[in-house]
From Swiss-Prot:
One of its GO terms (cellular component) is voltage-gated potassium channel complex. One of its GO terms (molecular function) is calcium ion binding. Ca(2+) 3 binds at residues 237, 239, 241, 248. The lineage of its organism: Eukaryota, Metazoa, Chordata, Craniata, Vertebrata. It is found in: Cell membrane. Detected in brain (at protein level). Expressed in brain. Highly expressed in layer IV of the cerebral cortex and in striatum and hippocampus, but expressed at low levels in cerebellum. Also expressed in heart. According to PubMed:11747815 expressed in heart at much higher levels than in brain with a preferential expression in the myocardium. Disulfide bonds: none annotated. Palmitoylated. Palmitoylation enhances association with the plasma membrane. This is A-type potassium channel modulatory protein KCNIP2.
Length: 270
């Protein structure tokens, strides 16, 4: 999506630093808030602890409230030092609004959470896996985190910037059904050759079972992931050529009510 030159030619991120409040300015309802926190816990650099509610922020003593940084002055020696410690600063807020389906306020909140976990402005695979593992202590999330990292790292340069992160998040949360299914296909297509093999699907499925841990599904047998994949792959590989194309993947998912319901769960996450 962006080359190395983009990560070296950086613009001022002051607009993204302008808010620590919740996305709408009001705390969400219980069910929406719970779903939002559950989803954000699955993503790096954007854990729910980075997004306090407005009521929590205002109720806290002044000394404990999140500090809202003043706008950076490029001519200030102090600000110049602060900026020099950041490896990557995202492009302008207006440009990110054009490229994603997030509002200005939403981008500010997402950037605050990202920067809290990734002060350098980018995250590599090892850091990504470390952050992700905090939310699945009962299992081994390392393999799934690697697959997810590669899906966010669209230009395959070994790092995920804030732009990479919000681009993927925008598709997952605000994209059309086809957009989301295309993103999911890319996640499963591990070698990025344009089709999904049974082995790739099995690798993903095993990583999910490993991540959830044996304590979550104690009754599952070791062969359960393979049986799951065999059943699912037979439905998707419509011409029985041993691979699933993007067309077969989308068509099969659109005809599965459970998958369609799961896609719609993300419509109002943020």
């Amino acid at each position: 999506m962006r080359g190395q030159g983009r990560k070296e030619s950086l613009s001022d991120s002051r607009d993204l630093d302008g808010s620590y409040d919740q996305l709408t300015g009001h705390p969400p309802g219980p069910s929406k808030k719970a779903l939002k926190q559950r989803f954000l816990k699955l993503l790096p650099c954007c854990g729910p602890q980075a997004l306090p509610s407005v009521s929590e922020t205002l109720a806290a003593p002044a000394s404990l409230r999140p500090h809202r940084p003043r706008p950076l002055d490029p001519d200030s020696v102090e600000d110049e030092f602060e900026l020099s410690t950041v490896c990557h600063r995202p492009e302008g807020l207006e440009q990110l609004q054009e490229q994603t389906k997030f509002t200005r306020r939403e981008l500010q909140v997402l950037y605050r959470g990202f920067k809290n976990e990734c002060p350098s402005g980018i995250v590599n695979e090892e850091n990504f896996k470390q952050i992700y593992s905090q939310f699945f202590p009962q299992g081994d999330s390392s393999n799934y985190a690697t697959f997810l990292f590669n899906a966010f790292d669209t230009n395959h340069d070994g790092s995920v910037s804030f732009e990479d992160f919000v681009a993927g998040l925008s598709v997952i949360l605000r994209g059309t059904i086809d957009d989301r299914l295309n993103w999911a296909f890319n996640l499963y297509d591990l070698n990025k050759d344009g089709c999904i093999t049974k082995e790739e699907m099995l690798d993903i499925m095993k990583s999910i079972y490993d991540m959830m841990g044996k304590y979550t599904y104690p009754a599952l047998r070791e062969e359960a992931p393979r049986e799951h994949v065999e059943s699912f792959f037979q439905k998707m590989d419509r011409n029985k050529d041993g691979v699933v194309t993007i067309e077969e993947f989308i068509e099969s998912c659109q005809q599965d009510e459970n998958i369609m319901r799961s896609m719609q769960l993300f419509d109002n996450v943020i």
